[in-house]
Amino acid sequence: MVPAWLWLLCVSVPQALPKAQPAELSVEVPENYGGNFPLYLTKLPLPREGAEGQIVLSGDSGKATEGPFAMDPDSGFLLVTRALDREEQAEYQLQVTLEMQDGHVLWGPQPVLVHVKDENDQVPHFSQAIYRARLSRGTRPGIPFLFLEASDRDEPGTANSDLRFHILSQAPAQPSPDMFQLEPRLGALALSPKGSTSLDHALERTYQLLVQVKDMGDQASGHQATATVEVSIIESTWVSLEPIHLAENLKVLYPHHMAQVHWSGGDVHYHLESHPPGPFEVNAEGNLYVTRELDREAQAEYLLQVRAQNSHGEDYAAPLELHVLVMDENDNVPICPPRDPTVSIPELSPPGTEVTRLSAEDADAPGSPNSHVVYQLLSPEPEDGVEGRAFQVDPTSGSVTLGVLPLRAGQNILLLVLAMDLAGAEGGFSSTCEVEVAVTDINDHAPEFITSQIGPISLPEDVEPGTLVAMLTAIDADLEPAFRLMDFAIERGDTEGTFGLDWEPDSGHVRLRLCKNLSYEAAPSHEVVVVVQSVAKLVGPGPGPGATATVTVLVERVMPPPKLDQESYEASVPISAPAGSFLLTIQPSDPISRTLRFSLVNDSEGWLCIEKFSGEVHTAQSLQGAQPGDTYTVLVEAQDTDEPRLSASAPLVIHFLKAPPAPALTLAPVPSQYLCTPRQDHGLIVSGPSKDPDLASGHGPYSFTLGPNPTVQRDWRLQTLNGSHAYLTLALHWVEPREHIIPVVVSHNAQMWQLLVRVIVCRCNVEGQCMRKVGRMKGMPTKLSAVGILVGTLVAIGIFLILIFTHWTMSRKKDPDQPADSVPLKATV
């Protein structure tokens, strides 16, 4: 038993699947069929098992049709019931189905296309019975000036609707019966070549043409119709126009009318072409317009071609040419040329040398004032108080030349030149042109030394070759590095090649070096003259005095360093030795040939001192703090007095001894002597006790020091001469004149003596002799007696003068009338 679900699936699947669409059937029925009806057209492939169904014939919309078609249910034929008119309907779209009473489709739909076959049952018709046309003289032959229109309702594309046009007659037939030609297929009426030549001689008249249209193409049979064409011959108005001048930047309402053309013939269409393309247009009446402002600088002239054409775009005649000239106005600024790279001008170029030539472009009309450009130099301006300028500009040519003011190398000058149109007149435009000028350097400066005299330079004769003697520096005022390259040479003063030069190629510094050994005996001095010159060729005046420099070299004699008689020295001293105690004498190994100056180094305690020239070493102070058995080391340095740089040194070791028992200080009187104050250049010799047999206990040497009294040490100075004598002088410039007793301590080994030196300090005369104060001499007047004598003498003189004047007065009273010169003088007693 089959399941219910499987049976339902089998039933529903065929209904769900789409049915195949039957192919369309095409049936042709002749138009205006004259036979019996109904006319069986075709048998449809109906199914056999569909006898129970109903055949339904419908139109292309699916609705049942009541037209001239029907279905024979018995035979299954499609039939037409009456004649069909193709011009009424050319095709019928039908579909046939087999349906149940409830509308269920058992078969179909079957599409059927019924085409009505055309037959020549229509007569062609002209669109007009009478055509009127105007023909202008000058129309080209073969160019249609009238198109005849005719129609045929038969099926298009068949011979039934294939029309042909013909001219049947022309009236009048003069001057030629074939004045016109008619294109058979298009119906285009044109002037024939013969008519074109005859038309010029023909009078202005109207021609009537009888034209025919026939269907069936070129077959002899067919339907036909006729019409009349009236052609009026008129004079040509297609004449050239004068050039049109339009101002650029014209401020009017656009489009702006500028001209008009006219083709006197009929059916004309105007076409405008602009060369180059421009803002122009033409309307149907032949009016020419400009549609916007013109720019002469963009396009100065246009060539317009206006064509008169028929409806098919064919020219009736040659196109008219119209020249449109754009008139210039001053609406453009002079444009300076692009700024070139910097223009280089050598310094010292003569006046009039052309620097550059400016050529400003003005886009206005060439040759007109609008484009007439002149030039004016704006910068640099003339300097105050200076005549002339460094640059000049020719106003017409724009040539920039050098002026009378000189230029300096290294200058970078920006020239500002004003370019003006309208020849500089008021109201014109202007631009500022820039020209950068660089003044290049030339080799017009000779190098010179900054110092012409160097030295004297001292060199020891043992200096090594290669030693730098001097560094010379030369400068060159030129700016170009190639012009600053220098060559150096020794011009004179070095015949033996003792010296040499070395320098860097791009440097102005040259080193004078020693090449050979110096010899003081051969040449104690040298004067080396060094010359400098430019490597590049010099322009202008040659080198001056500064191109040479003189180096003076002094050769120093080399002295061997001094040498002491010992490599080291030692001395012993009791720790109780007083200041000034003699220790030892430092001597050179060759004391005759050179003089040395001695000094102590590293005397940190300050216990010792050394005589500069004698080399005697003494204690400078008491040896406080020294212990017996200790040593004290200092360095003795000896310098050559003539060559301080030459020196020698040796260590001095002092051994401290135990102090011996202090002996009694013995006073030894010394005879008095005198010294002058203010101090003069002499002193007193103090002898040691060795000359006094009572004080001497042995032979020298002795050491001499002043006593410990601070006043004595301030006022007096004691200098040891040798081992037995000392020299006493004043330490101050002024010491009170009187007798002074100076204690001098003399020591020898462990013994000490004190000498009392009596010194009379006095004023001295010019001969250095002492002037002493003396007492009152016997019989010498006193001061009081001297004053009394002086007063008595003065009183006696006064009394005597009074007596003389009294006597003279009395003598004048005795003889008053006698002249004074007649009175004899009286002798006076």
Curated annotation (Swiss-Prot):
Domain of life from the UniProt record: Eukaryota
Region ranges (Ectodomain G): 666-786
Segments forming domain Cadherin: 25-126, 131-235, 242-336, 341-449, 455-564, 569-665
GO CC, alphabetical: basolateral plasma membrane; extracellular exosome; plasma membrane
Residues where Phosphoserine is found: 822
Signal peptide (UniProt feature, chain positions): 1-18
GO molecular function terms noted in the UniProt entry: calcium ion binding
Glycosylation sites: 517, 602, 722
Tissue specificity note: Kidney specific.
Gene3D superfamilies linked to this entry: Cadherins
Summary of the function given for this chain in its UniProt record: Cadherins are calcium-dependent cell adhesion proteins. They preferentially interact with themselves in a homophilic manner in connecting cells; cadherins may thus contribute to the sorting of heterogeneous cell types.
Localisation per UniProt entry: Cell membrane
Topological domains annotated Cytoplasmic: 808-829
UniProt remark on domains: Three calcium ions are usually bound at the interface of each cadherin domain and rigidify the connections, imparting a strong curvature to the full-length ectodomain.
Membrane disposition: Single-pass type I membrane protein
Keyword Electron transport tagged: no
Annotated InterPro entries: Cadherin, Cadherin-like_dom, Cadherin-like_sf, Cadherin_CS
Signal recorded as keyword: yes
Residues spanning the membrane: 787-807
Side Extracellular, residues: 19-786
Keywords: Calcium, Cell adhesion, Cell membrane, Glycoprotein, Membrane, Metal-binding, Phosphoprotein, Repeat, Signal, Transmembrane, Transmembrane helix
Protein name: Cadherin-16
UniProt GO BP: calcium-dependent cell-cell adhesion via plasma membrane cell adhesion molecules; cell adhesion; homophilic cell adhesion via plasma membrane adhesion molecules
